[in-house]
């Protein structure tokens, strides 16, 4: 027959095991709650950053309104929705002038690439600020080694890189 002291020791051991199990479950639950909160905060932060990038692009478009470029270099630009725009440039204008003229059109998506039809090539006309925003928006793809479409341009002149009367396609990047 177990003694009273032996019963107390068993009861104490059971209580201690129960308390240990409860502490373990509490710690696991707390860790899950912290992870959920961190994930929620991360999603909220990323959404805020995405909205800030979109606002930066919209503000840039507003700043450009009313600017017109003219010159002997003519380019036909086709947008993803099928609309077309004929642009004229001076041979001395930098490549970023092409970016400005393309992004100013309401048919232009926020994130895009520009390709020429012939010769088939990527046209890098992006200013540094857009390059940064683009890479932030698509950081997962660029980290996986995907082709970095929005490569920053150097100040190469339009005429040196794009033949007159070229057709350029603006491609939506998602």
Curated annotation (Swiss-Prot):
Gene3D superfamilies noted in UniProt: Phosphatidylinositol 3-kinase Catalytic Subunit, Chain A, domain 1 (3.10.20.90)
Tissue and organ distribution: Specifically expressed in the germline.
Keyword Zinc: no
UBX domain span: 74-120
Chain segments annotated as transmembrane: none
Pfam families in the cross-refs: UBX
Superkingdom as given in the UniProt entry: Eukaryota
Residues forming coiled coils: 8-58
Keyword Coiled coil: yes
InterPro entries from the UniProt entry: Ubiquitin-like_domsf, UBX_dom, UBX_domain-protein
Keywords: Coiled coil
Functional summary from the UniProt entry: Probably acts as an adapter for ATPase cdc-48.1 and/or cdc-48.2, conferring substrate specificity. Unlike other UBX domain-containing protein does not bind 'Lys-48'-polyubiquitinated chain.
Quaternary structure note: Forms a complex composed of deubiquitinating enzyme atx-3, adapter ubxn-5 and cdc-48.1. Interacts with atx-3 (via C-terminus). Interacts with cdc-48.1 (via N-terminus) and cdc-48.2.
The protein, known as: UBX domain-containing protein 5
Organism (species): Caenorhabditis elegans
């Amino acid at each position: 027959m177990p003694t009273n002291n032996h019963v107390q020791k068993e009861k104490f051991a059971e209580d201690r095991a129960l308390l240990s199990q409860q502490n373990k479950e509490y710690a696991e639950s707390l860790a899950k709650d912290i992870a959920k909160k961190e994930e929620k905060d991360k999603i909220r932060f990323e959404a805020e950053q995405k909205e800030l990038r979109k606002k930066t692009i919209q503000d840039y478009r507003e700043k450009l309104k009313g600017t017109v470029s003219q010159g002997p270099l003519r380019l036909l630009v086709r947008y993803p929705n099928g609309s077309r725009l004929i642009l004229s440039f001076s041979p001395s204008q930098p490549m970023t002038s092409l970016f400005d003229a393309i992004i100013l059109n309401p048919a232009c998506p926020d994130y895009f690439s520009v390709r020429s039809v012939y010769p088939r090539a990527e046209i890098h006309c992006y200013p540094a600020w857009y390059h940064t925003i683009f890479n932030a928006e698509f950081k997962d793809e660029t980290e996986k080694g995907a082709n970095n479409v929005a490569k920053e341009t150097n100040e190469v002149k339009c005429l040196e890189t794009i033949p007159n009367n070229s057709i350029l396609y603006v491609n939506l990047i998602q």
